[in-house]
């Protein structure tokens, strides 16, 4: 490991109900100074089928959380009620109301507890980021808790389960498609946006169809809300290095209030895979070639 590596801290906290124990991880910068104030970033997934507080650290999400911390943030991962690998009652707490998976109220309660224990965690500057179900929960956080979450980056979010796979949406939201589906849809709360929201999506995404982000985008437009949108014409259910760099810039600028490096080059595994495919002679251009059938 790098000499400056700082392992995340495991924490036990109390859920918003005041009695249920929830678990979390806290990532701090390698040069952490308890005398300073650090904005907090909540790295969320929120899908009922998984949990973030692990017995090991092999998942790429931990590297992303640690990378954000190195930019001068305290990054937290919290397994609120409705996530997996606990009791049946804990796991199924979000059934029929998937918007409560990992429970944003629990996340808010946890961050407030962490700020009270360590004042270096600036509870007045809280951001949130997530991918896929985490993108859904990130937008939900900005729309349902606009006074707490100030900046959010929602990547590839399934913002309405009516547009998502029935093997995920109906599995956790239930059937028939009734009023509860209106309650889970982020567009229902578009009028509440106050903070800075960046929506990110790949236009070739077959995991979460781009219609999900376009629907939310239109709802925000209908309510005359300011937001940011970053689309990738060649990306599927993934984000290239350029997208990661832009998310870093977004937090540095809007949450930390500092200047980000201009056009810093960052490559992801996706970028290297595309370079490898191109080197094999595969043409990645989608335009039709002369003489091909139309």
Residues of each region from the PLM?
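Serine-hydrolase catalytic core recognition
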Residues: 1-294
């Amino acid at each position: 490991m790098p000499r400056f590596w700082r392992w995340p801290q495991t924490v036990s906290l109390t859920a918003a109900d005041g009695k249920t124990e929830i678990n979390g991880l806290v990532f701090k910068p390698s040069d952490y100074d308890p005398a300073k104030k650090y904005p907090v970033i909540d790295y969320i997934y929120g899908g009922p089928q998984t949990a973030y507080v692990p017995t090991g650290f092999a998942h790429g999400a931990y590297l992303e959380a640690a990378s954000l911390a190195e930019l001068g943030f305290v990054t937290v991962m919290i397994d609120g009620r409705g996530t997996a690998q606990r009791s049946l009652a804990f796991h199924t707490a979000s059934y029929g109301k998937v918007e409560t998976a990992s429970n944003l109220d629990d996340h808010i309660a946890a961050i407030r507890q962490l700020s009270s224990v360590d004042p270096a965690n600036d509870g007045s500057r809280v951001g949130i980021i997530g991918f896929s179900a985490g993108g859904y929960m990130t937008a939900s956080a900005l729309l349902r808790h606009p006074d707490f979450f100030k900046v959010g980056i929602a990547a590839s979010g399934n913002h309405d389960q009516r547009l998502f796979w029935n093997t995920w949406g109906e599995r956790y939201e239930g059937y028939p498609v009734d009023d509860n589906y209106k309650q889970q849809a982020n567009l229902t709360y578009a009028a509440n946006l106050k903070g800075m929201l960046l929506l990110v999506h790949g236009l070739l995404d077959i995991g979460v169809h781009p219609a999900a982000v376009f629907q939310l985008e239109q709802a925000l437009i209908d309510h005359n809300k300011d937001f940011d949108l970053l689309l990738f014409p060649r990306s599927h259910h993934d984000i290239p290095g350029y997208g990661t760099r832009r998310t870093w810039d977004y937090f540095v600028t809007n949450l930390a209030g500092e200047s980000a490096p201009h056009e810093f080059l960052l490559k992801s595994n996706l970028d290297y895979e595309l370079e490898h495919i191109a080197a094999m002679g595969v043409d990645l251009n989608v335009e039709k070639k002369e003489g091909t059938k139309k």
